[in-house]
């Protein structure tokens, strides 16, 4: 058989062309597998989870809660843009400016966005603690609607409009730990209630 000048399967055994073709195919397959199996591609769920876990713990927040908020807000898309909010944590400009002096353009950097999102969660948490109304469902409502809106509803979750987002509905109903619909990068027993 002649494949563009490379003889394959000659009577004397494999030709040099066939060996080179086999090596090239093996090299391409190896390169593709190595690229596909990179565990921490920038902004991937596998990279985002350890970052959220570290930053949330340092800030005194439940990492599973923060990860679920990020997933609910953007499906972990670093370039998510609702027209009003940006990045993984879907931060609005006013929320961003409440907790940082960094330019809002930095909201496109997924690590900065998560860090500022956690700072805003802590800002909301401190308001709720001061008003003796802190709970993770209330914190989710304050993050989604703003702490003033939650206060105006008497800190009563029953008075707050239920979002269409299934993840937020679970969180606002008091579910913690593993949240159905959140795609965790590695599912372990610690995620399950």
What residues fall within each predicted segment?
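Alpha-helical segment that forms one wall of the substrate-binding/catalytic cleft
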Residues: 93-152
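Extracellular/periplasmic catalytic domains that process cell-envelope and extracellular macromolecules
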Residues: 58-62, 82, 133-135
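Residue-level detector of well-ordered alpha-helical segments, enriched
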Residues: 65-66, 87, 135, 139
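Export/targeting segments at the very N-terminus of extracytoplasmic proteins
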Residues: 26-76, 111-114, 122, 126-129, ...
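N-terminal intrinsically disordered, acidic low-complexity segments at the extreme N-terminus
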Residues: 1-5
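N-terminal Sec-pathway targeting helices
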Residues: 7-27
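Catalytic and substrate-binding regions of cell-wall glycan-acting enzymes that process beta-1,4-linked
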Residues: 134-193
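Cell-wall polysaccharide-cleaving catalytic domain and substrate-binding groove, primarily
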Residues: 52, 56, 69-97, 146-148
């Amino acid at each position: 058989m002649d494949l563009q000048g490379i003889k394959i399967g000659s009577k004397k055994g494999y030709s040099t062309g066939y060996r080179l073709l086999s090596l090239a195919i093996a090299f391409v397959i190896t390169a593709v597998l190595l690229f596909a199996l990179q565990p921490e591609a920038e902004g991937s769920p596998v990279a985002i989870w350890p970052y959220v876990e570290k930053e949330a713990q340092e800030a005194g927040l439940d990492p599973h809660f923060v990860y679920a908020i990020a997933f609910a807000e953007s499906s972990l898309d670093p370039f998510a843009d609702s027209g009003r909010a940006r990045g993984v944590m879907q931060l609005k400009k006013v929320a961003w400016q409440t907790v940082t002096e960094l330019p809002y353009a930095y909201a496109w950097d997924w690590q900065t966005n998560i860090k500022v999102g956690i700072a805003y969660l802590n800002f909301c948490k401190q308001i709720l603690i001061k008003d003796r109304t802190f709970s993770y469902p209330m914190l989710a409502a304050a993050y989604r609607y703003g702490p003033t809106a939650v206060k105006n509803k008497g800190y009563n979750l029953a008075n707050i409009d239920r979002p269409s987002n299934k993840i937020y509905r679970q969180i606002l109903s008091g579910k913690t730990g593993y949240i159905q619909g959140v795609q965790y990068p590695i599912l372990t027993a610690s995620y399950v209630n």
